[in-house]
Curated annotation (Swiss-Prot):
GO terms for molecular function: ATP binding; ligase activity. It comes from Oryza sativa subsp. japonica (Rice). PROSITE patterns: COA_CT_NTER. Belongs to the AccD/PCCB family. This is Putative acetyl-coenzyme A carboxylase carboxyl transferase subunit beta-like protein. The gene is accD. It is found in: Plastid, Chloroplast stroma.
Length: 106
């Protein structure tokens, strides 16, 4: 994998943008609409993004208590799948078994 794709983590950037949006929608209770549209973003779990995760979870729990409507559209969730298809075109990747083969799951 090229070094350019390992330099940054989108999770911390997305967390910085989404948390204020959700906090704004808590009072007064407003509907929340989020559309994800990533194009080949490498989603890595860096230390900084893992530190931000509890803040995102707690903010979402506060929003959930307001019982406001929520809509999330996952346009492209296949960034890793696209990478696998690019480098593993010669065989079909079975999503159920492939994670166990590479050691992603116990």
């Amino acid at each position: 994998m090229a070094l350019q794709s390992l330099r940054g983590s989108m999770r911390s950037v997305v967390g910085k943008r989404i948390c204020p949006l959700i906090e704004y929608a808590i009072f007064p209770p407003l509907p929340r609409i989020i559309v994800y549209a990533s194009r080949r973003a490498r989603m890595q779990r860096g230390n900084y993004s893992l530190i931000k995760k509890p803040k995102k979870v707690s903010t979402l729990r506060q929003y959930q208590s307001t019982k406001s409507p929520m809509y999330q559209s996952l346009q492209r969730i296949c960034g890793v799948r696209e990478w696998l298809n690019k480098y593993c075109m010669w065989k079909e990747v079975d999503e159920k078994d492939f994670g166990f083969e590479i050691g992603a799951f116990d």
